[in-house]
Amino acid sequence: MGRRRRRLPREPFEIAITGLSHEGRGIAHHDERTLFVHGALPGERVRAVYTKRRRSVAEARVVEVVSPAPERIAPHCPHFGVCGGCSLQHLTPERQVELKQSVLMEQFHHMGGVQPERVLAPLTGAPWGYRRKARLAVKHVPRKGGVLVGFREKHSPFVAEMDRCPVLDPRVGERLTELGRLIEGLSIPDRVPQIEVALGDETGALVFRNLAPLTAADLNRLAGFARDSGLAVYQQPGNEATMALVHDPVGRRLDYALPGHGVRLGFRPGDFTQVNAEINRAMVDQALDLLAVEPGQRVLDLFCGLGNFTLPLARRASEVVGVEGAEALVERGRENALRNGLDNVRFYGADLTLAAADQPWATGGFDRVLLDPPRSGAFEVLGLVAALGPKRIVYVSCGPATLARDAGELVHRHGYRLTAAGVMDMFPHTAHVESMAVFQREAQD
């Protein structure tokens, strides 16, 4: 017979917060345990209750702030603390960015044994209404009056009860209640678990995941919402290949512009694109400035997606090669190059975790390389990248630990210097750390 799990004590207890974790939780010590406290900041005294407790580590949440820290602010969103979409709204935006910068530098030190020669100024933008890509949870809850649409609760798998979301682009963030009513009126309100949000500059799309067939009346209802909202509506009964258009009131592809580089990039609802258009524009500008591509040079863009960096690079370089593992994005990159009239760029599909020197794209050497890998990093391809001879590498990262690991490899094994690094606040009010680093060969160009 298994051991019974001990019940957590329900009584609040008072503690002093001494630090802040990488995830934005307060750190304290209580009952001979390291305690991570949701909603607490360094220097505060708070009353908290346990949410999880193990032998040496425990978690808790704040029920009362006894003495607040100077950087504490009132959360903008009334759902903060319950909704799991944000974790840092109680912290000033400036301090949020400082936290992310410190996380990056700590990871460089601990994971890579390196430090940048120069810290880049953080890229920041509008803190609200920035999010263009999201996966919204949906739950039919008759006892709460219908269908809930939003993010899941911080401390449970339930969907948070929310009427709006201020971090979402208002084209969707102001329509959560409307979306709930829409689904409630379908014949299968309990069989629609998710809505995928994909927004471009002027157009947008919602993909309704349906686990049972929609009736003709359901499709008419969804089409009516599309006409009223101006957003294209899709249904998806199975995997991504089953996605089918219900109605597009605009009849234009999803796309976004990079005005500083004279390109527009089209995409489909299921494609990967950056969630924050303002930061994405600043990120592309900074990456190209740091690469410092000169006329006549060849550039390699690894993990290139649909051409977010590739096409702007093609405006400056003699030749650009983009390599991506997802074939759908490779095709999108080619389409985008054609639409933008760029004939000096080639896209290849390849699994970059199995990079080998005999790849058709890995020929001729490159003057510059841009890396934009997933959270798992680019470790497997670094040896090949170094062998291709680029004097400068710009690495765009969504995982500070893997960036730091890869930085250590480039510096200690392959003879590069980490000349600069800094953060980009792609996800304000969350603990997500996006960053950029520049590597230079010891021989100056």
Swiss-Prot record:
<keyword id="KW-0411">Iron-sulfur</keyword>
<dbReference type="InterPro" id="IPR010280">
    <property type="entry name" value="U5_MeTrfase_fam"/>
</dbReference>
<feature type="active site" description="Nucleophile">
    <location>
        <position position="398"/>
    </location>
</feature>
<dbReference type="GO" id="GO:0070041">
    <property type="term" value="F:rRNA (uridine-C5-)-methyltransferase activity"/>
</dbReference>
<keyword id="KW-0808">Transferase</keyword>
<keyword id="KW-0489">Methyltransferase</keyword>
<feature type="binding site">
    <location>
        <position position="303"/>
    </location>
    <ligand>
        <name>S-adenosyl-L-methionine</name>
    </ligand>
</feature>
<dbReference type="GO" id="GO:0003723">
    <property type="term" value="F:RNA binding"/>
</dbReference>
<dbReference type="GO" id="GO:0005506">
    <property type="term" value="F:iron ion binding"/>
</dbReference>
<comment type="function">
    <text>Catalyzes the formation of 5-methyl-uridine at position 1939 (m5U1939) in 23S rRNA.</text>
</comment>
<protein>
    <recommendedName>
        <fullName>23S rRNA (uracil(1939)-C(5))-methyltransferase RlmD</fullName>
        <ecNumber>2.1.1.190</ecNumber>
    </recommendedName>
</protein>
<feature type="binding site">
    <location>
        <position position="83"/>
    </location>
    <ligand>
        <name>[4Fe-4S] cluster</name>
    </ligand>
</feature>
<feature type="domain" description="TRAM">
    <location>
        <begin position="6"/>
        <end position="64"/>
    </location>
</feature>
<dbReference type="InterPro" id="IPR030390">
    <property type="entry name" value="MeTrfase_TrmA_AS"/>
</dbReference>
<feature type="binding site">
    <location>
        <position position="308"/>
    </location>
    <ligand>
        <name>S-adenosyl-L-methionine</name>
    </ligand>
</feature>
<feature type="binding site">
    <location>
        <position position="324"/>
    </location>
    <ligand>
        <name>S-adenosyl-L-methionine</name>
    </ligand>
</feature>
<comment type="similarity">
    <text>Belongs to the class I-like SAM-binding methyltransferase superfamily. RNA M5U methyltransferase family. RlmD subfamily.</text>
</comment>
<dbReference type="InterPro" id="IPR030391">
    <property type="entry name" value="MeTrfase_TrmA_CS"/>
</dbReference>
<keyword id="KW-0479">Metal-binding</keyword>
<keyword id="KW-0698">rRNA processing</keyword>
<keyword id="KW-0408">Iron</keyword>
<dbReference type="InterPro" id="IPR029063">
    <property type="entry name" value="SAM-dependent_MTases_sf"/>
</dbReference>
<feature type="binding site">
    <location>
        <position position="351"/>
    </location>
    <ligand>
        <name>S-adenosyl-L-methionine</name>
    </ligand>
</feature>
<feature type="binding site">
    <location>
        <position position="372"/>
    </location>
    <ligand>
        <name>S-adenosyl-L-methionine</name>
    </ligand>
</feature>
<dbReference type="GO" id="GO:0070475">
    <property type="term" value="P:rRNA base methylation"/>
</dbReference>
<feature type="binding site">
    <location>
        <position position="86"/>
    </location>
    <ligand>
        <name>[4Fe-4S] cluster</name>
    </ligand>
</feature>
<dbReference type="Pfam" id="PF01938">
    <property type="entry name" value="TRAM"/>
</dbReference>
<dbReference type="InterPro" id="IPR001566">
    <property type="entry name" value="23S_rRNA_MeTrfase_RlmD"/>
</dbReference>
<dbReference type="InterPro" id="IPR002792">
    <property type="entry name" value="TRAM_dom"/>
</dbReference>
<feature type="binding site">
    <location>
        <position position="165"/>
    </location>
    <ligand>
        <name>[4Fe-4S] cluster</name>
    </ligand>
</feature>
<feature type="binding site">
    <location>
        <position position="274"/>
    </location>
    <ligand>
        <name>S-adenosyl-L-methionine</name>
    </ligand>
</feature>
<dbReference type="GO" id="GO:0051539">
    <property type="term" value="F:4 iron, 4 sulfur cluster binding"/>
</dbReference>
<feature type="binding site">
    <location>
        <position position="77"/>
    </location>
    <ligand>
        <name>[4Fe-4S] cluster</name>
    </ligand>
</feature>
<keyword id="KW-0004">4Fe-4S</keyword>
<dbReference type="Pfam" id="PF05958">
    <property type="entry name" value="tRNA_U5-meth_tr"/>
</dbReference>
<dbReference type="InterPro" id="IPR012340">
    <property type="entry name" value="NA-bd_OB-fold"/>
</dbReference>
<keyword id="KW-0949">S-adenosyl-L-methionine</keyword>
